[in-house]
Swiss-Prot record:
Superkingdom of this protein's organism: Eukaryota
UniProt key word Glycoprotein: no
An individual GO BP term: mRNA transport
Organism name: Vanderwaltozyma polyspora (strain ATCC 22028 / DSM 70294 / BCRC 21397 / CBS 2163 / NBRC 10782 / NRRL Y-8283 / UCD 57-17) (Kluyveromyces polysporus)
Compositionally biased spans, kind Basic and acidic residues: 8-25
Gene: DHH1
Name of the protein this chain belongs to: ATP-dependent RNA helicase DHH1
Species classification: Eukaryota, Fungi, Dikarya, Ascomycota, Saccharomycotina
GO molecular function, one term: mRNA binding
Amino acid sequence: MSTQIEDQDWKSKLNIPKKDTRPQTEDVLSTKGNTFEDFYLKRELLMGIFEAGFEKPSPIQEESIPVALAGRDILARAKNGTGKTAAFVIPTLEKVKSKHNKIQALIMVPTRELALQTSQVVRTLGKHCGISCMVTTGGTNLRDDILRLNETVHILVGTPGRVLDLASRKVADLSECNLFIMDEADKMLSRDFKSIIEQILVFLPKNHQSLLFSATFPLSVKEFMVNHLHKPYEINLMDELTLKGITQYYAFVEEKQKLHCLNTLFSKLQINQAIIFCNSTNRVELLAKKITDLGYSCYYSHARMKQQERNRVFHEFRQGKVRTLVCSDLLTRGIDIQAVNVVINFDFPKTAETYLHRIGRSGRFGHLGLAINLINWNDRFNLYKIEQELGTEIQAIPATIDKSLYVANDNSAVPVPFPIEQSHVQPSMQQQHMPLPPQQPIPNQQFGGMPQQYSPQQQQYQQYPPQGMAMPPQGIQMQQQPQF
């Protein structure tokens, strides 16, 4: 009798975080009403799911988890920010046997930051399961990875080049890896990675199960499906490509006035955290310097930085130590930072696919977000083309933007991100003190009817973080570029 009572009360003993009370869209709410318990998952996994703050499965999780548990190959297409990572991590943790000390699942992702994030989702959801997860990416010490693989690893998360290197050296034994997963499958099967993926598959058992997840499925994915998947179960939840919770605006502005416009946006928008995208690494560094010159705290990240510095920037931005991150398309793939409510395309992207992934960094998991695009005369054809391809309307920016479109009523409801394993992160950046700029207008430039001046709200914003400003990582030499 006491055992039955204990079985009924196990949920009440969990350390469940504060409920996320922010409004959500039907991107994550239009489900069939199933719960995680309906999937008959093991108790230890359910404990990790609920302690991570998950309440009910999203549509992609509801569709894919039971099919994956049944052992079928899956080709799943769903919007960015709707819970795809948990959709494959949960069945992976359920299928992996903790007492079998072999690599049983391989999760492939295109970027190092996404590998770190995915591994932490595995560790967070599986913290009661006794399952070991290792992340391996290029740009890190190969010897360290070899030493770690001498210990028990059940789930390997990595980028293609490093995984192939370890498998070719016979350091990573994939002979009993019966579960192969590709997140951002469209990127994984692009020309950059396809040949490497084909080589990795040679090391896996022939009858392995494959799970492919992405927001877009080009022809390369269909070719892979024909050649390597066995009667895959296809899931398509893309009635439209863009997230319903993201409001999109554009503003025509001359190149030399973009910085003024950005400064106005900083002063007028209620930014929780923002990501600003540029089309080149040189422009990323230059814009980050200009933003800090204006008195705002700012980090930057791009592919030419050392991996430890990229990890540090990613970790501290996720932890909310700075509000603004300037980056290239390095962080367009799968990166989930719940506190980001504004995305600004300082440089307008060239393709609809890039645009879709960029704006998907806001409005995560059905919440509200704002995407603002600074458009010059040369971008007007791209703007029209992207609207047509995505079937969406990007509106002209109004004089004032309704805060209810992108700001949660209760900012404390934003969940704390999964922690990044400290072994992958360098010590915190040394903050530097800088006086606030004077409260005076910036030269006569107006944008969308909004005057260029430092408001009390902007001064409060400039004081974040309280102890000063965060410069771009130390040791990175700024590139010489023309002024904006």
